[in-house]
Amino acid sequence: MKNIKFGSLEDGRTAGLYILESAVGMRAAVTDYGAALVSLAVPDSKGVMRDVVLGYDDAHGYETGSGFIGASVGRFANRIAGAGFELNGQRYSLTANDGTNCLRSEEHTSELQSRI
């Protein structure tokens, strides 16, 4: 495993990129900013390595971009209708960030945090 600098965050901290490679050449790159999968290189049918993941070139892209690209950590997956739910008689309200629904997570939560 290699660890390289992946850029600086707006608050001045440095984000790292961890590159893991298998014995057969498959390569994954994950940043400690949101545990986002930055790239995944696998061989195509002719053995040529291809990156099959949409990712940004540096930490700044993940910090300022949209769409949860590469995000692997979040409070919940998919959409919570009505931006809220009830559990054991207790009503929990979430941020409506997709019309009247809450999509994937609220603003400034797990998927957008540095794991440094």
Task: Please tell me what each predicted stretch does.
Residues 100-104:
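Short, Lys/Arg- and Gly-enriched loop/turn segments at beta-strand edges
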Residues 62-70:
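Short, basic/aromatic beta-hairpin or loop at an interaction surface
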Residues 7-10, 71-77:
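Short Gly/Pro-enriched turn/cap motifs at secondary-structure boundaries
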Residues 50-52, 71, 78, 114:
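Residue-level marker of intrinsically disordered, low-complexity segments enriched
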Residues 107-116:
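Single conserved hydrophobic/aromatic residue that forms the stacking wall/gate
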Residues 4-56, 81-96:
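Beta-strand-rich N-terminal accessory domains
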